[in-house]
Amino acid sequence: MKMTGAKMVVEALHQEGVETVFGYPGGAIMNVYDEIYKQNNFKHILNRHEQSSIIAAEGYARATGKTGVAIVTSGPGFTNAVTGLADAYMDSIPLVVISGQVPTTIIGTDGFQEIDAVGISRPCTKHNYLVNCIEDIPRIIKEAFHIASTGRPGPVHVDIPKDITAEIAEFVYPKEVDLPTYKPTVNYNKKQLRKAMNAIANAKKPLLYVGGGAILSNCGYEIRELAEKLNIPAVETLMARGIMDDKNPLFVGMLGMHGEYAANMAAHETDLLISLGARFDDRVTGRLDEFASKAEVIHIDIDPTSIAKLVKPDYPIVGDLKITVKAMLESISEYEFNDYTNWVELLRDYREQEPLRFVDSDKEIKPQWAVKRLGELLDDKAIISTDVGQHQMWAAQFYPFSFPRQWCTSGGLGTMGFGLPAAMGVAKALEDTDKVSVNITGDGSILMNIQELTTCVEYNIPVINVILNNNYLGMVRQWQTMFYDNRLSETDLSSQPDFVKLVEAFGGIGYRVSTKEEFDAAIKDAVEKKKPAMIDVLVARNEDVLPMVPNGHALNEMTLLEGGDNE
């Protein structure tokens, strides 16, 4: 069947089973938007900024495991999208981002809204394409979805000149891809896995170190089963929250710069670190030469470039994590494992001696209390998104996560402004469920993409934004207090809008909360009304995120809270 290049794009998305697209139109992509107008195979959400379009597609992808899709125009439309691309690239989120480009006859002439989009996207995408002829559109989009979702996932950028979207050719959508140089290693090396299993059997203090790859490979429940069958304790990175279920007695906590005392001590004292889809990020390891320095290391990852990049493993295994962990489970009966009970009990003692806690108050709301109370009120009914800052760490520490993909945050890039558009994408993914999409944010972060409240209202996307409002850029203020002799340079945010009036101006529901009773009432009311909402929680200004491993220190060299009795 013959059709325009623009219709090919829309038809290809339909062929890939796309249900929701986020985007913002403009001149170079207008032909594609004309075809979107004519179709009813997928829904299009009009964001109010291209960065939000990409991040909303991320939120959708993180919540569902599907490939998110966003469409933007050329020039500033694309440059606005770059932060979202970089965020998805750092966290390995599968996206296909389609951008318009100036006509091929104008490329290279500094035409209106021309930018070298593929040159810009090269370092922040898994792969990118500039479409040179209309016949390539079906193949390229098919390849883009395949590349984005296989191996180590990531964003793929497809740049299409406007004249190519106007041309007409035969549409033939390929049934499969032919990429001879792209063959991700899925199946593990059996010999290496046997060596790793022997190492586990002989270890005295093994530890599962679970990273974001466990979410991406959908093997959270297999990892729980592995931990429980072998009685091995587990720690999670920021990106892996929810894998183990916080109530699991083998869960020792989140590790890293703001990890739990017991989790960080577990990594420091283990004699066998079993890395499952983790990449040894600097915010996790602390001083690298001291990280798990007493341990042999098993590193399982689908990306061979991640292995030995920072820590040289004794047992490197390249392969799909879900397939590999299933094989580990199936082979358990072939080995005699040590009894790890004493090790498990030692780590439980650590958690009891130095639990996560804060000094509560009857006179003001502590931000940690707000997160903890939110967890008590919503528990597993909510999918939690966050922005970046102190509130992000408190959310990771104090919200009780119980299943994979319950947590949506910007880890690698640390993108302020991530929370609201990501929570929108999550909410679209949750439309047919009874789950609630909640964005835990700060008074700094929320203003970075505040315009998306309009999008939420227009499409009735019921995101509940909980602002932990301390009138500071809180994490920067904390570092200035701890490491810069309290020189608070440009971190005071006392001059802020009235957030209740602001959300009401956008057409949403607003609440201002200064007592614990008001907090409970606001959360319950927002959940019941199922409308876009913003809860401005006035919290104590000078709280710090603790524990904290200062830069250049080992994980066992934590700054801990003095006092406090609330776990």
Protein language model features and the residues they cover:
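N-terminal alpha/beta PP-like core and its mobile active-site loop of ThDP/TPP-dependent enzymes
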Residues: 1-335, 373, 377-380, 434-436, ...
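Active-site diphosphate/adenylate-binding microenvironment
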Residues: 6-9, 14, 18-19, 32-36, ...
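A generic structural signal for residues located within well-ordered alpha-helices
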Residues: 52, 116, 218, 365-369, ...
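Thiamine diphosphate
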Residues: 98, 106-113, 308-310, 316-318, ...
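Phosphate/pyrophosphate-binding active-site segments
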Residues: 135, 294-390, 516-517, 523-525, ...
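Active-site-proximal structural scaffolding
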Residues: 227, 267, 367, 449, ...
